[in-house]
Design a protein with these regions (language model features):
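BTB/POZ (also called T1 in voltage-gated K+ channels) oligomerization domain detector
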Residues: 1-47, 171, 183-264
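Residue-level signal for the start and early helices of compact helical domains
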Residues: 14-19, 24, 55, 81, ...
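Post-BTB helical module
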Residues: 28-125, 229, 233, 239-241, ...
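Alpha-helical protein-protein interaction/assembly modules
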Residues: 70-197
Length: 264
């Protein structure tokens, strides 16, 4: 009774009367219609929907206001989010007004080097997102350099530390030669979590730093106090962008809700 794609239109007034005279829906591809049937009857091909299928579902939900199709598409994207580059997810969030994974995708994006992001993505992400990303990268790089150059203070030495001066000097040197190098490595700068993991593996290579002082200092470093401000700034920026750029569509009525509404 319905046909999709670019089929020739039936004689005016006869569309929908029989299988030979279907109602043409030119905006709906065959794949979209098959996906709609999968949504309606909860029956999917064994391998499940592909990424392109999910995009078609989102387009279908936008065009025909199908809340169920939208919910299923967003669920699949969220489940598979770590298989996709964060900039691809952000572009989808902006195109289809999805807030669910905008913030975590932006947080992942910040860990990318600018040169590793394909040029066309700048246009897809738009001026606001790209400009915020570049500005944030500059601020975070500056913050990283400050942290690398300023070791956490050794406020109080352990009672068993017999040479406080030597302990403090070697602590400062240890920080610069290890943690600073991990953070500022020109070829492979490490994020804070990775840098801390490498730092605590130094083991006995701590010079004249007293072992008990080292344990206390390591606990301070692992708390990540110096990086909390950076994390908070990234999250706050992502939330502001999401609120400013994305407006989720109004909740669409399901078939059951439409039937209930029409019967009243």
């Amino acid at each position: 009774m319905f046909a999709v794609g670019g089929q020739s239109r039936p004689i005016e007034g006869t569309d929908g009367l029989s299988d030979d005279h279907p109602i043409i829906i030119p905006e709906l591809s065959t794949n979209m219609f098959e996906l709609y049937l999968s949504v309606a009857y909860g029956s999917w091909k064994p391998e499940g929907p592909t990424h392109n299928d999910i995009i078609d579902l989102l387009r279908f939900s936008n065009k025909f206001m199908s809340q169920k199709a939208r919910d299923i598409a967003i669920h699949h994207l969220h489940e598979q989010r770590f298989r996709h580059k964060p900039y691809d997810l952000l572009a989808l969030c902006l195109e289809f007004s999805i807030t669910k994974f905008f913030v975590p995708a932006f947080q992942r994006l910040v860990e990318f080097r600018i040169r590793d992001i394909p040029g066309p993505m700048q246009k897809k992400l738009g001026f606001e997102v790209w400009n915020a990303f570049v500005d944030l990268k500059e601020l975070l790089d500056e913050h990283r350099r400050i942290v690398a150059c300023e070791e956490p203070p050794l406020i109080e030495h352990a009672a068993c530390c017999t040479d406080n001066t030597a302990c403090s000097i070697d602590w400062r040197q240890l920080w610069w030669n290890s943690m600073a190098r991990f953070l500022l490595d020109g070829r492979n700068p490490q994020v804070f979590r990775e840098a801390v993991n490498c730092f605590q593996e130094l083991g006995s290579e701590i010079g004249r730093v007293n072992p008990e002082c080292w344990k206390a200092l390591l606990q301070t470093v692992k708390k990540g106090t110096a990086f909390h401000l950076a994390y908070d700034l990234v999250e706050e920026t992502a939330q502001q962008l999401s609120a400013a750029l994305i407006t989720e569509p109004d909740q669409m009525l399901t078939r059951a809700e439409l039937d209930a509404f029409s019967s009243n």
